[in-house]
């Protein structure tokens, strides 16, 4: 039986909110400590040091961010509950008890009505017995009946409000309950992995925290969680990353709606998502940029172009984004895509022997999210024309000569060829082998127009393995366009996307992980983990698990050879 004690509930909610506020303050301090530890590159060196920093970066930081979101959302639900109480009982010291209303109150009203009806009938019988002697009016109890009916309606309405309030607030807490269970599972997983007589976090491997216990025996390509595995037993970290990605998008949406117009300095360059001020560096060589290659960057509230011509580049603001209408296919998409000027980061690192982020830092800038695609190594081999690299090196050592940089860039390009498949041998033989393997395992052919598209992509684009957070964001984007992409696949291939004819049940948990009538898994031929396009030509239906996880992603797949060298170390 449900009971609403307004005063006690208000006090309980307020006490909980105060505790959450204290936890949030402690959490923020802990986040700063973890951030500091993860950034101790000078103190934590070598493989062991890198493993420790990676462990805290991947295992602790996302959890703390997720916990912070949980606190904010839980507080929001509690405050909504406080506000909703008045719609049920306006008295701050009121009390509603289902047991009393359902039994005592209803029985009392019913008993009063029955007694009144009996007395009315008795009186009317007596008056009718003497109506030949004296004329007396009959007793009318209709008014009392109306009052009792109104009382019964009030009881029913109050109970309905109580049930509705209870149901709505319980439903509102479901998300918080689910997030709490996710955090609990994650803590249990960490305890299993890193609790014992000897904790070996110095041997932690990047991305291993994404693996749930049920997935430990699944052999997957590239050693990462397949973004297409949409099932109930996703790892806790993967579920947290997905929510963090969604939360990041909501922040982007709020940024889009702001009306502040900010002027962007032209004297900046983006390297691996970091902004460096080049105002103190050399002026651009006079170059004709009329036929230059154009890339786009979003910085603060302004979109600007990067012009690349030969060995020179320049930046030019285009428009304030707060002055134009945007949607998920425009500005939001730009903000959510890559944050790295591919090639410049590796070239800088190769030329100087140092991480540009750990070099001399210039004036800090606001948050930057860039959508610059890869820049050919040949076009940035003489980066010192734009930036005096010496000024970004702590010890003042001179950068390698331009010729040395070109050689390094050439070697880098060779590695990129191994990843992207631009070598002739891979394009002509290995891609066909990979395609035939997919066809053989799934029993469905890849049409020529699809294979041609895949060859073109692998020739012209360099695919690199993404970080867990980048992979989660990439997966979230695909979830939004999956049905559209499948429809385009059907239109372009002339085939019908197959569906499961019966439920697929997990052998370990007994849970239904694919329902009858659900579409087959959408396999990214160029892996999602490597930034494979969410396009029809990069999709192929695969049945879980034999055709997909244990098939295309299984041991011996040509994909392992096709993307050989692409993994980050």
UniProtKB/Swiss-Prot annotation:
It holds the Pfam family LXG. Keywords: Coiled coil, Hydrolase, Nuclease, Secreted, Toxin. Disruption phenotype: Deletion of the yxiB-yxiC-yxiD-yxxD-yxxE operon has no visible growth phenotype, however it is out-competed by wild-type cells. CDD domains: HNHc. Residues 1-235 form the LXG domain. One of its GO terms (cellular component) is extracellular region. Residues 548-569 are annotated as: Disordered. Induction: Expressed on rich and minimal solid media likely in early stationary phase; dependent on DegSU. Not expressed in liquid LB, but only under conditions that promote biofilm formation. It is found in: Secreted. The keyword Cell wall biogenesis/degradation does not apply. Disulfide bonds: none annotated. Residues 8-91 form a coiled coil. InterPro entries: HNH_nuc (IPR003615), LXG_dom (IPR006829), PT-TG_dom (IPR027797). GO terms for molecular function: nuclease activity; toxin activity. Its main location: secreted. Probably interacts with cognate immunity protein YxxD but not with non-cognate immunity proteins. The interaction inhibits the toxic activity of YxxD. Toxic component of one of 6 LXG toxin-immunity modules in this strain. They promote kin selection, mediate competition in biofilms, and drive spatial segregation of different strains, indicating that LXG toxins may help avoid warfare between strains in biofilms. Mediates intercellular competition during biofilm formation; disruption of the operon disadvantages the bacteria, but overexpression of the cognate immunity protein restores growth in competition with wild-type. In the N-terminal section; belongs to the LXG family. This is Toxin YxiD. The gene is yxiD.
């Amino acid at each position: 039986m449900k009971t609403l004690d307004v005063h006690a509930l208000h006090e309980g909610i307020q006490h909980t909110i105060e505790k959450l506020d204290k936890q949030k303050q402690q959490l923020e301090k802990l986040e700063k400590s973890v951030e500091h530890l993860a950034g101790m590159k000078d103190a934590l060196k070598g493989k062991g040091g890198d493993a420790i920093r990676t462990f805290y970066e991947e295992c602790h930081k996302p959890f703390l961010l997720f916990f912070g979101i949980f606190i904010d959302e839980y507080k929001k639900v509690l405050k909504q509950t406080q506000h909703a109480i008045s719609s049920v009982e306006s008295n701050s010291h009121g009390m509603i008890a289902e047991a009393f209303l359902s039994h005592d109150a209803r029985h009392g009203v019913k008993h009063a009505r029955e007694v009144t009806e009996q007395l009315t009938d008795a009186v009317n019988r007596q008056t009718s017995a003497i109506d030949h002697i004296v004329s007396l009016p009959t007793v009318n109890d209709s008014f009392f009946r109306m009052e009792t009916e109104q009382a019964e309606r009030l009881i029913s309405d109050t109970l309905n409000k109580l049930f509705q309030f209870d149901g709505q607030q319980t439903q509102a807490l479901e998300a918080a309950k689910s997030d709490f269970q996710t955090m609990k599972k994650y803590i249990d997983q960490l305890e299993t992995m890193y609790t014992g007589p000897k904790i070996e976090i110095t041997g932690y491997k990047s991305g291993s925290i994404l693996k749930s216990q049920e997935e430990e025996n699944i052999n997957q390509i590239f050693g990462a969680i397949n973004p297409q595995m949409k099932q109930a037993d996703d790892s806790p970290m993967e579920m947290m990353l997905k929510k963090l990605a969604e939360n990041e998008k909501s922040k982007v949406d709020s940024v889009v709606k702001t009306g502040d117009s900010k002027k962007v300095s032209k004297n900046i360059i983006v390297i691996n998502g970091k902004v460096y001020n080049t105002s103190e560096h050399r002026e651009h060589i006079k170059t004709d940029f009329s036929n230059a290659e154009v890339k786009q960057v979003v910085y603060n509230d302004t979109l600007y172009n990067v012009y690349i011509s030969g060995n020179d580049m320049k930046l030019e603001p285009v428009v304030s984004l707060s002055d134009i209408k945007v949607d998920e296919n425009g500005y939001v998409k730009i903000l959510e895509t890559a944050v790295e000027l591919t090639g410049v980061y590796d070239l800088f690192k190769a030329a100087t022997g140092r991480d540009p982020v750990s070099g001399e830092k210039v004036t800090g800038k606001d948050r930057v999210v860039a959508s610059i695609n890869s820049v050919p190594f040949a076009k940035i081999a003489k980066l010192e024309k734009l930036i005096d690299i010496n000024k970004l090196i702590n010890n003042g050592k001179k950068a390698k000569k331009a010729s040395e940089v070109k050689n390094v860039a050439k070697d880098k390009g060779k590695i990129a060829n191994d990843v992207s498949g631009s070598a002739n041998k891979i394009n002509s033989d290995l891609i066909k082998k990979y395609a035939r393997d997919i066809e053989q395992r799934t029993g469905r052919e890849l049409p020529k127009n699809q294979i041609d598209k895949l060859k073109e992509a692998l020739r012209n684009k360099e695919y690199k393995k993404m970080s867990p957070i980048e992979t989660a964001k990439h997966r979230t984007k695909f979830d939004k366009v999956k049905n559209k992409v499948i429809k385009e696949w059907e239109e372009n291939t002339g085939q019908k996307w197959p569906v499961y004819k019966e439920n697929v049940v997990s052998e370990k948990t007994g849970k239904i992980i694919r329902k009858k009538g659900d579409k087959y898994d959408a396999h990214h031929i160029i892996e999602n983990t490597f930034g494979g396009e969410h396009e029809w030509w990069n999709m192929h239906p695969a049945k879980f698990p034999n055709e997909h996880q244990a098939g295309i992603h299984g041991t011996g797949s040509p994909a392992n050879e096709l993307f050989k060298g692409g993994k980050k170390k």
